[in-house]
């Protein structure tokens, strides 16, 4: 198991017990490492600074005990934000209908980067469906998605604000 997978396996249960969901873990940098943890509240309420501080204290204590990273690092905790990364299969379903940018590991019709309206997953849950203006609908195998994130649009902002009012 690689370090990122080990970190996810270590951190996710702790966040779950606190009422949060792990969105992404990234360890970046060469000489100065930064461990970035992105989390969301399970109850759907927008993350606040206090939520990030609670997660930081809990994860910091956990990592001090388990010590999975041998070098010095900086811990950063954040919410996904409005133009959030799409990292889990359920993200592609939950955010269907909104504009997204995606990058695939393998070229599809000679391209690796795409931008279009997210349609969600196919019935088998294997392919991410996206409508590109010039090319029509395409399907990218979920396993081949290198990166994906929502595009900040007026529609996305309005939907996010509406969700917070409810």
Curated annotation (Swiss-Prot):
Alphabetic keyword roster: Cytoplasm, Ribosome biogenesis
Domain of life per record: Bacteria
Chief location: cytoplasm
Gene Ontology biological process terms from the UniProt entry: ribosomal small subunit assembly; translation
A Pfam family of this chain: DUF150_C
Signal peptide: none
GO cellular component, one term: cytosol
InterPro entries: Ribosome_maturation_RimP, RimP_C, RimP_C_sf, RimP_N, RimP_N_sf
Disulphide bridges, residue numbers: none
Keyword hit for DNA-binding: no
Compartments reported by the entry: Cytoplasm
Keyword flag Cytoplasm: yes
Protein task: Required for maturation of 30S ribosomal subunits.
Family classification: Belongs to the RimP family.
UniProt-listed NCBIfam families: PRK00092.2-5
Protein's name in the database: Ribosome maturation factor RimP
Gene: rimP
């Amino acid at each position: 198991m690689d370090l990122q997978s080990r970190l996810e396996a270590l951190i996710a249960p702790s966040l779950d017990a606190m009422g949060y969901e792990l969105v992404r873990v990234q360890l970046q940098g060469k000489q100065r490492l930064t461990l970035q943890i992105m989390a969301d509240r399970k109850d759907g309420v927008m993350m606040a600074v206090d939520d990030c501080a609670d997660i930081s204290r809990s994860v910091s204590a956990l990592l001090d005990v388990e010590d999975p990273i041998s070098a010095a690092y900086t811990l950063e905790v954040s919410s996904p934000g409005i133009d959030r990364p799409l990292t889990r299969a359920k993200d592609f379903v939950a955010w269907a209908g909104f504009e997204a940018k995606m990058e695939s590991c393998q070229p599809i019709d000679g391209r690796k980067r795409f931008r279009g309206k997210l349609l969600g997953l196919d019935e088998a849950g294997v392919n991410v469906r996206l409508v590109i203006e010039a090319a029509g609908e395409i399907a990218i195998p979920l396993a081949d998605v290198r990166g994906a994130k929502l595009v900040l649009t007026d529609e996305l902002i309005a939907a996010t604000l509406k969700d917070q009012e409810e």
